[in-house]
Regions:
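Acidic, surface-exposed loops and disordered segments
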Residues: 1-148
Length: 148
């Protein structure tokens, strides 16, 4: 079995994380793998946002928890110290498919590099909220993007 197929077979969603920050060079490699994802017509309309700031990470978690309807204090990111948010241009009809391929690459690369990962939903709802739109604006992202 090839290394790639073996990694696909053994990758699992992780729902308990260490508090230790993932080294930046590892995060960079994971993000780079996301850039290699296939996309409709080769458009590459997805963007990735790395979140390692604990205060911002906790705020995103609180909003995600509220959207998900969980009890206050539940962390839908399971204590992960870092996250990579994937967004795609709202105007692109293949946005969900393209963003999903990016997510798959990110999770597979994380596994290859010894880092646990888990796809967490509700980014679409978070970035439709005024708070999410303001966050994107503060990061210099002016176009309309949808969370994947």
């Amino acid at each position: 079995m090839s290394d790639v197929l073996q990694k696909m077979e053994t990758r699992r969603s992780i729902r308990k994380f260490k508090a230790d920050m993932v080294p930046q060079d590892i995060i960079d490699k994971i993000i780079e793998a996301g850039l290699y994802a296939a996309s409709g017509h080769g458009e590459q309309n997805t963007i990735m946002i790395q979140v390692t700031n604990k205060e911002l990470r906790d705020k995103i978690s609180q909003i995600n928890c509220k959207i998900g309807g969980w009890k206050k204090g539940f962390d839908p990111f399971y204590g992960a110290p870092a996250m990579i948010i994937v967004l795609a241009k709202k105007s692109w009809p293949n946005r969900v498919y393209d963003g999903s391929l990016v997510m798959g690459n990110l999770m597979l690369a994380a596994h290859e590099l010894g880092i646990g990962s888990c796809w967490i939903h509700r980014a679409k709802e978070e970035f439709e909220m005024d708070w999410g739109k303001e966050l994107l604006k503060s990061l210099g992202i002016e176009e309309e993007y949808e969370g994947i």
